[in-house]
Structures are given as C-alpha cells and as structure tokens.
Regions:
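Phosphate/diphosphate-binding loops
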Residues: 83, 87, 95-136, 251-262
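Short glycine-aspartate micro-motif
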Residues: 47, 69-75, 117-119, 262
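Mobile "lid/hinge" segments at catalytic clefts and subdomain interfaces of large enzymes
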Residues: 81, 87, 116, 123-188
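Conserved phosphate-binding/catalytic loops in two-lobed NTP-binding clefts
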Residues: 258-273
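Nucleotide/phosphate-binding catalytic cleft detector across ATP-hydrolyzing
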Residues: 1-71, 186-235, 246
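A short acidic Gly-Thr/Ser loop motif
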Residues: 52, 74-80, 120-123, 241-245
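Single conserved hydrophobic/aromatic residue that forms the stacking wall/gate
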Residues: 278-297
Length: 297
C-alpha cells in the first residue's frame, strides 16, 4: 500500500504546485480527522474508508444543525452501500476494523482508529444475475462507472440497480443524470429480457425484484449497525446521501419503522461537504524503546 499511496500523493502534490495552489493540502483520515501528506505517506492505512468517514462526520454536523442527535447514516454509491450509527451526536470510533470481511473471507485487520462503518456490495452499479437454480441476486459485482449501467449507453452488458430503477420509473427516464445523459431504454429492455425469460417474469416484475433484493441487502447492513448492537432503529432518524441514497431510503425506513428520513441538499456530494468541516487530527503513535538501551541509560 505504501509505495502506491506515496506515488499517488506525490503526483497530486506536483499537480497542485503546477496549478499554483498556495494553500496547505491535507488528506482525510479514517479516524475522522485530516493529516498532512507527509504523515499520510508514512502510514497510508490511515486513509482507509476516509471517503465514507467524511459522510458520517457530515451527518453528525447536520444533526447538530437540525437538532437530530440520534442518526443512522446510509451512503449509497455506485458499488457499495455504507451504514453507520451516531448516538447523542457522537460518531463511533473503533480499533478493530476489518477490510473485505464477509461471509466468504475473514478479511484483513486494521489496528488503527476508524469510524465504525458497515459496508456491503450494493450500489447503483450493482449487477443483477440469476444463478443455476434460477435465483435472482444483486451484487456484489459492479458495472462501475465505465461502462456503467446499460442505460448509460456506453456498452454496458449487465443489468444494474440503476437500470431497474429506470424501468420502474423510480428514476425519471426523461431527466436521467440531470438531463445530461439520454437513458438508453431500448438497450435496457433487450438486456433484461434474458433474465426475465429465465425467471418467467415480465421486465418490470424482474426490475421490481432487483430493487427488493437490493433493499433487503441494505436492510441487513442497517441492522448490523443498529439492531445487532442493541439499538432500536425507531429511536433514530435515517440520513441518506450518495448518488443512490435517496432512491432507497424511504423503503428501508418503512421496513425498519424509522420515523424520519433526512435527505440533505446536494446529497450526492454530501461527503465532500462533510470533508470541508473536518479538523486536523493525528492519532497517538506508540513509542518503542529497547529494554536493554533503557537499562543502560
């Protein structure tokens, strides 16, 4: 990780200098603070989950402004959905975070302070597929941003959650991506047809099934940060952000009896807003002293 992170930050710094940037650049940290390029290059693991952390910190700040201290956050992007819990305005920090931990992998431990976030492989680009037993699944594979969902018209060949939302008109087909992209609905219909035929559904029924499965996966993630840790979701409000957060939030809140859903202005870039509010922070680092040297002194 270190060589890649060092190279990336060095190139970024060179570009900032070339652009006549006169400020002091900092890097978001997974513990909820920011640190210098040099410190981050020394321990790049402190950047893990730093992007989603910005969103959680932003939700906590938003909660203070609107007097909502108990929040569950839902950040739905293109590949993943991430959840966290804020109690009495406090963001939870843990030191036993595991990367890539799931039912098939033990994951990798990160023994550093990290905002407590649960992540699953379900987002707007998550691919719908049918297994050999004719069972419909959504994710964890993703179409990414390029080629992206079939509806992008960029050569995508797999139906995604975004395509399903377009078929069911949960996304306005005539104002897709703010009107910047014309949704290729002909390609969407042709691509979902084999799935529908295998399932013996209409295209719209298949699309509704994709959305229900995606929602169910997200509900499980929300339960991991709440019910599984002894919290009652009914005592919290749900803050939804990211490109797809608002698309699924009300259905999830209804399922978990969460009384209020909050969708911030410019929710698709809400994590960037949260990042702008972060303070400089550096985790305490242990000092190792040789016992023999210590005795000699």
């Amino acid at each position: 990780v270190k060589p890649i992170a060092r190279s990336y930050l060095d190139k970024l710094n060179d570009k900032l200098i070339a652009a006549n940037f006169s400020g002091n650049p900092y890097v978001m940290q997974s513990n909820g603070g920011i640190d210098t390029f040099e410190s981050t290059k020394a321990i790049p693991l402190t950047m893990i989950e730093s992007g989603p952390t910005s969103g959680v910190l932003g939700a906590a700040e938003l909660g203070k402004l609107i007097k909502e201290n108990n929040l569950i956050t839902l950040d739905v992007g293109g590949t993943t959905a991430k959840c966290s819990l804020i109690e009495n305005g406090n963001v939870k920090i843990i030191t036993n975070y595991w990367i890539e931990k799931n039912r098939k992998s033990a994951g990798y431990p990160v023994m550093l302070p990290v905002v407590d976030i649960v992540e699953i492989g379900n987002g707007g680009g998550s691919i719908a597929w049918v297994d050999n037993y004719d069972k419909l699944h959504v994710g964890p594979q993703s179409a990414g941003a390029d080629p992206g969902p079939v509806s992008y018209g960029k050569g995508g060949t797999s139906i995604t959650t975004t395509d399903a939302n377009l078929i069911t008109n949960r996304i306005n087909q005539n104002y897709f991506c703010g009107g910047e992209i014309k949704a290729d609905m002909d390609a969407v219909s042709k691509t979902i047809a084999p799935l529908s035929k295998k399932l013996k559904f209409t295209n719209e029924e298949t699309a509704r099934g994709i959305i229900r499965i995606a929602n169910n996966n997200m509900i499980n993630a929300l339960k991991l940060v709440s019910v599984n840790k002894g919290y009652d979701p009914r005592d919290f409000s749900l803050v939804a952000f990211g490109g797809g957060g608002g698309m699924h939030a009300t259905s999830l809140a209804k399922e978990l009896n969460i009384p209020k859903v909050i969708i911030p202005v410019n929710s698709s870039v809400f994590s960037a807003w949260g990042l702008s509010l972060i303070h400089i922070s550096e985790p305490t680092r242990p000092l190792y002293i040789s016992y023999a040297v210590f005795c000699l002194k």
